[in-house]
Amino acid sequence: MAGQGLPLHVATLLTGLLECLGFAGVLFGWPSLVFVFKNEDYFKDLCGPDAGPIGNATGQADCKAQDERFSLIFTLGSFMNNFMTFPTGYIFDRFKTTVARLIAIFFYTTATLIIAFTSAGSAVLLFLAMPMLTIGGILFLITNLQIGNLFGQHRSTIITLYNGAFDSSSAVFLIIKLLYEKGISLRASFIFISVCSTWHVARTFLLMPRGHIPYPLPPNYSYGLCPGNGTTKEEKETAEHENRELQSKEFLSAKEETPGAGQKQELRSFWSYAFSRRFAWHLVWLSVIQLWHYLFIGTLNSLLTNMAGGDMARVSTYTNAFAFTQFGVLCAPWNGLLMDRLKQKYQKEARKTGSSTLAVALCSTVPSLALTSLLCLGFALCASVPILPLQYLTFILQVISRSFLYGSNAAFLTLAFPSEHFGKLFGLVMALSAVVSLLQFPIFTLIKGSLQNDPFYVNVMFMLAILLTFFHPFLVYRECRTWKESPSAIA
């Protein structure tokens, strides 16, 4: 049966990778799309009378309001990308895969059609389209992350691979920009993306489960076109019960796996994890690093325009370079491989000591969390230096840092908390971090206004905040030390 199921699992994996790569995270290619919108005179009426023919080529200050409008659209889109993860996570947990994916397809298709038929006169519709596009994209990601459960001990690698593909999909807007420069209209590109929704529908019913993919994977598990494979309702309920028992045992140490200990485990509700110190510091870690990334992406067009002295040819070159570097799918799996390798190492140690598998999972996340903070610090340092050629290095550090950020986030929540709460905890941390991400617009306004386009003081504050994020892996490391000294102390 395993041999028969492997081709289906591989097909699900590869098509899910393509879906995340081509559709899920396109919002983060925003600078490329802004370049096209400016050439199409979107929000051109906000520019002063002395502005050049393509925005702020000759009068940078005159198009400040136009830049702010594009920044506001990105702020709203990125906010919805995170904030709506909580309700969409609930939808996924409550109504399962098929319903969640059909909702995603509806939002995504509607958004791409709106963008396809907008023009400079109806540019305000972007405020509706971009949030809808991101809601559909994040639902694609959430429903695909469970595919890692099909591959057992490689689960972290698959999760980080999908998050890397999510990041890399920002290159889609670069392709649209390049096609636009070759004469393919914006409308034609987005109509093509809309037509691709038929593929999403087919994949939903042929290569995805109606419900959830359980972990650990029960014997003879099947899904897709013939999900039941003759399995009766009673057998399914028995398999689900056994799966819940296996999941519970994952979060109990060898000494605690007694009939009485199961009763203690049931007392741990979703809110007990949501209000834990571990979750709180993870929220701080994610919010600070993510805010810096969002601010950088949302203001990149304006930043490059200032550094290039209004030379739009150079701005186009660096915008293309930024988009070309956005293939996080190439570096994200290294993060997952690191965690999987460390987890296997700590599992051997746990078998010798009879220690908790939760502690094993926690220990495997420490290097990844710390490395993500270090990469972001390097990225912030390079971005703070107003030398245009140095931004090539900034772009590389940015994509590696962002790939590690979202891969580490999803993997940490998967490994550090019970899987039955993953959808809700993932949604909650993204929703709360979305509230923090709203700060990007007032910060952008501050830079454009009081600081007179000089982001130096803002960059210094962000670097100090990024240093604070190192406290999260330090606390997780302390928990691991506590486990080694007293295995029953980890909960």
From Swiss-Prot:
Gene3D superfamilies: MFS general substrate transporter like domains (1.20.1250.20). The modification Phosphoserine is found at S253. Widely expressed with highest levels in the liver and lung, followed by the pancreas. Highly expressed in macrophages. GO terms for molecular function: adenine transmembrane transporter activity; fatty acid transmembrane transporter activity; guanine transmembrane transporter activity; xenobiotic transmembrane transporter activity. Keywords: Cell membrane, Glycoprotein, Lipid transport, Membrane, Phosphoprotein, Transmembrane, Transmembrane helix, Transport. Adenine transport is strongly inhibited by decynium-22. Sodium-independent purine-selective nucleobase transporter which mediates the equilibrative transport of extracellular purine nucleobases such as adenine, guanine and hypoxanthine. May regulate fatty acid (FA) transport in adipocytes, acting as a positive regulator of FA efflux and as a negative regulator of FA uptake. Belongs to the SLC43A transporter (TC 2.A.1.44) family. This is Equilibrative nucleobase transporter 1.
